Amino acid sequence: LLGGKHVIVEKPAAMIPEHIYELQALADKSNLMYTVMHQNRLNPAVVALKRAVDENRFGKITLATVRLRWCRLQEYYEDGWHGTWLMDGGVINQQAIHHIDALQWICGPVRSVVSANSNALNKLEAEDTSISLLNFEDNFLGIIEATTAARPRDFEASISVLGEGGFVEVGGRALNKIVNWEFVESTDQDRLEVKKSSEEV
């Protein structure tokens, strides 16, 4: 930014919130962009879910969720930087951030958040388990359930949207598969959408 260039960084944007505000202010002052790469927004399954929301296929949305149940053994946190507040953060900042970004991109701004965090199994500075209740600006609720204390392996990483008009769940290894796609008013395109929007990674 000081060199007059736009900046794209890998997550996280910064480890301390004040640093994000400083970087954004510098970018704004210089008429430059400072942003974080969240590549899951480009996945066909995520794009299909976003399009369904934008086309009002759900009608009134009633619930939106992120579920991440991954396994990180204690050795993962013993390298000196994983799980530290200064260099890494916990499950929210390190693992679930891409899913949370996709959910907010799909469903819009969040008005308020209430969270509870813990170290369920692992010993680290930050959290290995987090539950959050979201209140979206469009007056529906959301839930973030994220943990690296799943055993013995990674089980799930998904985003789902539920509304009066249907239910869609995107999962897979990298938010790359449509797991559920069902609407009250289905179209001929729905089956094709599921097939073309799910890809192997």
PLM regions and their residue ranges:
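Contiguous beta-strand/loop segments that form the cofactor/metal-binding neighborhood of enzyme cores
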Residues: I100-N176
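Short aromatic-enriched loop/helix-cap "lid" or pocket-rim segments at secondary-structure transitions
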Residues: Y21, A48, Q74-G80, E125-E127, ...
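C-terminal helical cap and adjacent loop that interface with cofactors, partners, or active-site loops
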Residues: D190-V201
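Structured helix-beta-strand junction loops
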Residues: G3, K29-S30, M87, P109, ...
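Beta-strand-loop-alpha-helix segment that lines the small-molecule cofactor/substrate pocket
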Residues: L1-R41, N56
